Amino acid sequence: MFGADKGTADKLDGKKLHIGIVQARFNENITNTLAAACRAELLRLGVQEKHIRHVLVPGALEVPVALQAMAERDEYDALIALGCIIRGETYHFELVANESGAGVTRLALDYQVPIANAIITTENLEQALARQTEKGVDAARVAVEMANLLEELS
């Protein structure tokens, strides 16, 4: 939920992490801002620039395929999915939102790699614009927190 109380994570340290980012180009004005906010937060959390791999795909439905290719390489401590799906006049919104989300979740479970899902789904452009920076930052923080947690649990 936008503006929700997300709680406070313990110290987030990304110094030793390798992060993969897959960004959908569709609604590029939004996804570019998501990506910039995400990258800035990763760097702020200590992830080294050289340890961030950022790739672009056409749209949200293609994000899981690229995430899978990254997960199969076993080089990343966490992955991040970035995209923006804005409701239109047809059922296509539900299809893209549901299938991209299911694909991201399935990959995280199948490969046991944390994937921060910041494929935002909104009713309109105004909602997307209001969320683009916060959700990019959130994705970076989730990726770092979950990568560290899974390392601790292994």
Curated annotation (Swiss-Prot):
Q: Which SUPFAM superfamilies match?
A: Lumazine synthase
Protein's pathway: Cofactor biosynthesis; riboflavin biosynthesis; riboflavin from 2-hydroxy-3-oxobutyl phosphate and 5-amino-6-(D-ribitylamino)uracil: step 1/2
Q: Which residues bind (2S)-2-hydroxy-3-oxobutyl phosphate?
A: 89-90, 131
Q: Which GO terms describe its cellular component?
A: cytosol; riboflavin synthase complex
Note the InterPro entries from the entry: LS (IPR034964), LS/RS (IPR002180), LS/RS_sf (IPR036467)
Q: Which GO terms describe its molecular function?
A: 6,7-dimethyl-8-ribityllumazine synthase activity
EC number(s): the record gives: 2.5.1.78
Q: Which Pfam families match?
A: DMRL_synthase
List the coiled-coil residues.
none
Q: Does the keyword Transferase apply?
A: yes
Question: Which residues are annotated as active site?
Answer: 92 (proton donor)
Going by the entry's taxonomy, the superkingdom of the source organism is recorded as Bacteria
Q: Say which family it is in.
A: Belongs to the DMRL synthase family.
Query: What NCBIfam families does this protein map onto?
Result: lumazine-synth
Descriptive protein name: 6,7-dimethyl-8-ribityllumazine synthase
Originating species? Acidovorax sp. (strain JS42)
Organism lineage reads as: Bacteria, Pseudomonadati, Pseudomonadota, Betaproteobacteria, Burkholderiales
